[in-house]
Amino acid sequence: MAQKVEAQGGNGGNQWDDGSEYDAVTKIQVAAGGNGIEYVKFTYVKNGQTEEAPLRGVKGRSFEADPFVINHPEEHLVSVEGRYNPEGLILGLTFKSNKKTSDLIGYEDGTPFTLQVQDKKIVGFYGFAGNNLHSLGAYFAPLTNVTPLNAKKLEAKGGDTGDIWDDGVYDNVRKVYVGQAQYGIAFVKFEYVNGSQVVVGDEHGKKTELGVEEFEIDADDYIVYVEGYREKVNGMTSEMITFLSFKTYKGKTSQPIEQRPGIKFVLQGGKIVGFHGRSTDVLDSLGAYISLSPTPNLHGKWTKVDENGDGPGLRCSHDIAQVGNKIYSFGGEFTPNQPIDKHLYVFDIESRTWSISPATGDIPTLSCLGVCMVSIGSTLYVFGGRDASRQYNGFYSFDTTTNEWKLLTPVEEGPTPRSFHSMAADEENVYVFGGVSATARLNTLDSYNIVDKKWFHCSTPGDSLTARGGAGLEVVQGKVWVVYGFNGCEVDDVHYYDPVQDKWTQVETFGVRPSERSVFASAALGKHIVIFGGEIAMDPLAHVGPGQLTDGTFALDTETLQWERLDKFGGEEETPSSRGWTASTTATIGGKKGLVMHGGKAPTNDRFDDLFFYGIDSA
């Protein structure tokens, strides 16, 4: 709620009030006559739309000054200085913004007054007017209602009814108050910090007898993650927020995060420095402002790669791998649970052209989905995947110099047959982790040595690394890392396996952590593991539906165990849209190493056929 500063002058004429719901004042028109100020007229901006208020006073044979124009959002109105006479008429006015001051309009006689509040801006006016302007008062709002260039406004999630509110942007969030209603969240209120000043925000919604929960953030900590659920409840025509949990950079959580009814949403991507949304008697929606780090440890950029020729087309649940200047694609589906083909597609990076690779030898007998593929040298290695009747493929190699397939291990002789597992490789070993067999999810890790041509069953990881599918699997500095996945619900734990010691270790990560997810794109880039998108909540129809998919590019530093978000909002970068079940690999394009991904499942349950590359500039 804006701060109302008392009107100065008299109370003759009629009372008027432009209101306080605007974002800023953008233009002021004033006319002065023999008795002082004859009229004022203000133009405001609200949600990007210009709104002209009525003329306050009467147009006569007066001198109309040049309009005082305020260049929102870089400029804002700070104060008004004026004078009024004993009869209660405003004689003169001067307006000041943070960048300039208007000329005096009217006379310098009379009693002086000033409308100003430190660290706030004027967002509305009110007063009395008849044939002249009798009095003038103002509404003030925090300066932080203007989004700074280094902050990003995240769209509010939830319903589209209720009053719009916006607390603006601050240095930090100090406290969070959440009030409960019978079916969800009744109200929220936030306390912020601006420099040494504590700013108490308004209550959004309405308190009930069910109480209020308070979450305090330490002075050296900040919120990086909000998880919520939205749902239409009790016959409502629009969604409301039914659950909220706040998590800080140091891992402090306001509420235990667990699966709940409704549609899950997350607000994340950096330090959260403000909130906005809609409310009625309940909290209808919630969005946030995030402060983006100006100097990420890993620098890169997304580009969409042009594609020509006969390629894989629209599909998901396939895999890709790079050999030299070519990217290979195998497996996948267009219709849920229906494999498309068993072609091996090859993309020439130089010509940007897809084609179907010639193939001889032990060509895989099954068209499959949920397959994995990696490369070592000039050879591709393909394991698992299933057809529509849940028959599984074995373990194959493909020599890209001779275009020959070889069946290295039949289904019945190798690791447990599976789909939606994860694969990675180093110079001599292919690693296969997790996935879904005919009867259960798995948490085993097997390695195949390409020199000895033998499988090795790695040590059992223990209870902390639950059986899962759709995890990220990358080899970084000799360790095999398992990142996130799905074990019946989305998880966010991270583990690594040391092949030398045959030992598993779970690690605690921190920073701007991505939310729980699976079936995301991933790549190993130096000491970092970079991921994009994925599924954050399973669809009620399981693999038949799209699930709840997300976007976002994150990097985990495997030495410091710190996560950071890499996306550059706006500018020339063409960031991929939300997706999961995409094919991805570590690749080099145009001399840059990065994450390349193809296709995937869209939130609409459609399929993508695009090719994106996140190329690293420096690390």
From Swiss-Prot:
<keyword id="KW-0479">Metal-binding</keyword>
<dbReference type="Pfam" id="PF24681">
    <property type="entry name" value="Kelch_KLHDC2_KLHL20_DRC7"/>
</dbReference>
<feature type="domain" description="Jacalin-type lectin 2">
    <location>
        <begin position="151"/>
        <end position="292"/>
    </location>
</feature>
<feature type="repeat" description="Kelch 3">
    <location>
        <begin position="429"/>
        <end position="478"/>
    </location>
</feature>
<feature type="repeat" description="Kelch 5">
    <location>
        <begin position="528"/>
        <end position="583"/>
    </location>
</feature>
<dbReference type="InterPro" id="IPR015915">
    <property type="entry name" value="Kelch-typ_b-propeller"/>
</dbReference>
<dbReference type="GO" id="GO:0016829">
    <property type="term" value="F:lyase activity"/>
</dbReference>
<feature type="repeat" description="Kelch 4">
    <location>
        <begin position="480"/>
        <end position="524"/>
    </location>
</feature>
<feature type="active site" description="Proton donor">
    <location>
        <position position="441"/>
    </location>
</feature>
<feature type="binding site">
    <location>
        <position position="386"/>
    </location>
    <ligand>
        <name>a (Z)-N-(sulfonatooxy)alkanimidothioate</name>
    </ligand>
</feature>
<feature type="binding site">
    <location>
        <position position="419"/>
    </location>
    <ligand>
        <name>a (Z)-N-(sulfonatooxy)alkanimidothioate</name>
    </ligand>
</feature>
<feature type="binding site">
    <location>
        <position position="519"/>
    </location>
    <ligand>
        <name>a (Z)-N-(sulfonatooxy)alkanimidothioate</name>
    </ligand>
</feature>
<dbReference type="Pfam" id="PF01419">
    <property type="entry name" value="Jacalin"/>
</dbReference>
<keyword id="KW-0880">Kelch repeat</keyword>
<feature type="binding site">
    <location>
        <position position="535"/>
    </location>
    <ligand>
        <name>Fe(2+)</name>
    </ligand>
</feature>
<feature type="repeat" description="Kelch 1">
    <location>
        <begin position="326"/>
        <end position="374"/>
    </location>
</feature>
<dbReference type="InterPro" id="IPR033734">
    <property type="entry name" value="Jacalin-like_lectin_dom_plant"/>
</dbReference>
<comment type="function">
    <text>Specifier protein that contributes to constitutive and herbivore-induced simple nitrile formation. Promotes simple nitriles, but not epithionitrile or thiocyanate formation. Converts allylglucosinolate and benzylglucosinolate (glucotropaeolin) to their corresponding simple nitriles in the presence of myrosinase.</text>
</comment>
<dbReference type="GO" id="GO:0005829">
    <property type="term" value="C:cytosol"/>
</dbReference>
<feature type="binding site">
    <location>
        <position position="581"/>
    </location>
    <ligand>
        <name>a (Z)-N-(sulfonatooxy)alkanimidothioate</name>
    </ligand>
</feature>
<dbReference type="InterPro" id="IPR001229">
    <property type="entry name" value="Jacalin-like_lectin_dom"/>
</dbReference>
<keyword id="KW-0430">Lectin</keyword>
<keyword id="KW-0456">Lyase</keyword>
<dbReference type="GO" id="GO:0009506">
    <property type="term" value="C:plasmodesma"/>
</dbReference>
<dbReference type="GO" id="GO:0019762">
    <property type="term" value="P:glucosinolate catabolic process"/>
</dbReference>
<protein>
    <recommendedName>
        <fullName>Thiohydroximate-O-sulfate sulfur/sulfate-lyase (nitrile-forming) NSP4</fullName>
        <ecNumber>4.8.1.5</ecNumber>
    </recommendedName>
</protein>
<dbReference type="GO" id="GO:0009845">
    <property type="term" value="P:seed germination"/>
</dbReference>
<comment type="similarity">
    <text>Belongs to the jacalin lectin family.</text>
</comment>
<dbReference type="GO" id="GO:0030246">
    <property type="term" value="F:carbohydrate binding"/>
</dbReference>
<dbReference type="InterPro" id="IPR036404">
    <property type="entry name" value="Jacalin-like_lectin_dom_sf"/>
</dbReference>
<feature type="binding site">
    <location>
        <position position="543"/>
    </location>
    <ligand>
        <name>Fe(2+)</name>
    </ligand>
</feature>
<feature type="repeat" description="Kelch 2">
    <location>
        <begin position="379"/>
        <end position="425"/>
    </location>
</feature>
<dbReference type="GO" id="GO:0046872">
    <property type="term" value="F:metal ion binding"/>
</dbReference>
<feature type="binding site">
    <location>
        <position position="539"/>
    </location>
    <ligand>
        <name>Fe(2+)</name>
    </ligand>
</feature>
<dbReference type="GO" id="GO:0080028">
    <property type="term" value="P:nitrile biosynthetic process"/>
</dbReference>
<feature type="active site" description="Proton donor">
    <location>
        <position position="386"/>
    </location>
</feature>
<dbReference type="InterPro" id="IPR006652">
    <property type="entry name" value="Kelch_1"/>
</dbReference>
<keyword id="KW-0408">Iron</keyword>
<feature type="domain" description="Jacalin-type lectin 1">
    <location>
        <begin position="2"/>
        <end position="142"/>
    </location>
</feature>
<keyword id="KW-0677">Repeat</keyword>
<feature type="binding site">
    <location>
        <position position="470"/>
    </location>
    <ligand>
        <name>a (Z)-N-(sulfonatooxy)alkanimidothioate</name>
    </ligand>
</feature>
<feature type="binding site">
    <location>
        <position position="441"/>
    </location>
    <ligand>
        <name>a (Z)-N-(sulfonatooxy)alkanimidothioate</name>
    </ligand>
</feature>
